[in-house]
């Protein structure tokens, strides 16, 4: 329901103009995804879709237009399945793995596998999409480190 409320507010506030931005840690329906895309937003996917039971998210990541997808870690929150420990495991002393930006390539590999495409092509598309969604990002990156590294 919160996605629908945000979409309604964006439609009202936008007055018909497209938005630039990313629906962070998107976990909505196919209809909500399309509504975000129609408003000009990109959809952020991260660790949540690495769980095999996340069927809807995995289907969206596989089927949505590549131009709508941005990869994200949401570190330290929303760890991928390989870092997650259950409440029972934690009560027995097993530590929760720490989600860090270094997990992004492995998360992206899951999405690339779902889409049946090379990891590098997904990484480039995600970078391009992030730069479209956040137009000032390119100039900020250039000012901070001389360009995009690792894309």
Give the positions of each predicted feature.
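Catalytic pocket-lining loop regions of alpha/beta-barrel enzymes
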Residues: 1-71, 79-82, 132, 142-150
């Amino acid at each position: 329901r919160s996605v629908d409320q945000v979409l309604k507010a964006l439609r009202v506030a936008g007055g018909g103009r497209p938005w630039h931005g990313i629906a962070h840690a998107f976990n909505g329906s196919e209809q909500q995804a399309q509504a975000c895309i129609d408003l000009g937003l990109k959809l952020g996917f991260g660790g949540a879709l690495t769980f095999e039971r996340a069927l809807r998210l995995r289907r969206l990541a596989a089927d949505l237009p590549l131009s709508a997808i941005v990869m994200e870690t949401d570190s330290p929150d929303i760890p991928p399945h390989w870092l997650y420990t259950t409440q029972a495991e934690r009560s027995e002393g097993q530590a929760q793995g720490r989600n860090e930006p270094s997990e992004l390539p492995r998360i992206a590999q899951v999405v690339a596998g779902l889409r049946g495409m090379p990891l590098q092509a997904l990484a480039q598309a995600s970078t391009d999409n992030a730069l479209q969604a956040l137009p000032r990002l390119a100039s900020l990156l250039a000012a901070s480190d001389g360009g995009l590294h690792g894309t």
